């Protein structure tokens, strides 16, 4: 999928404080209990999607795209946002990802590992 898309450069995207809040809280929901590297990786996947022509071109568009992130569909993200559950490390990871840092290359997906799925394993997720 990544090979079929065209990519914008991170310098072509500007993020708001609201984007930072949203991304940090998504990172909290998806990887709050993971090592810091796993938090950065989740943020990097979201930013990679923003930069890819295959996905929506805004951070909120990517996060709220139907069926993509489980905490959106379960209501967990809404609760985290209402209470600003994101930790300092989640905010640091969001800042790194929004500045273009990636420890997962151009990966645009992650999940819990399943047999036969090749990718980059960080914490309890595989990134691909």
Language-model regions, residue ranges each:
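Bacterial extracytoplasmic/cell-wall-associated proteins, especially those involved in peptidoglycan
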Residues: 3-128
């Amino acid at each position: 999928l990544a090979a079929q898309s065209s990519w914008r450069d991170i310098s072509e995207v500007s993020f708001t404080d609201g984007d930072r809040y949203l991304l940090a809280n998504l990172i909290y929901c998806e990887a709050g209990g993971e090592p810091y590297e796993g938090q950065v990786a989740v943020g990097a996947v979201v930013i990679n999607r923003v930069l890819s022509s295959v996905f929506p071109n805004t951070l909120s568009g990517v996060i709220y795209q139907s069926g993509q992130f489980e905490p959106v569909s379960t209501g967990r993200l809404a609760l985290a946002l209402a209470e600003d559950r994101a930790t300092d490390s989640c905010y640091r990871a969001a800042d790194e990802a929004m500045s273009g840092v990636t420890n997962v290359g151009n990966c645009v997906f992650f999940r819990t590992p399943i047999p036969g799925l090749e990718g980059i394993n960080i914490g309890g997720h595989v990134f691909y």
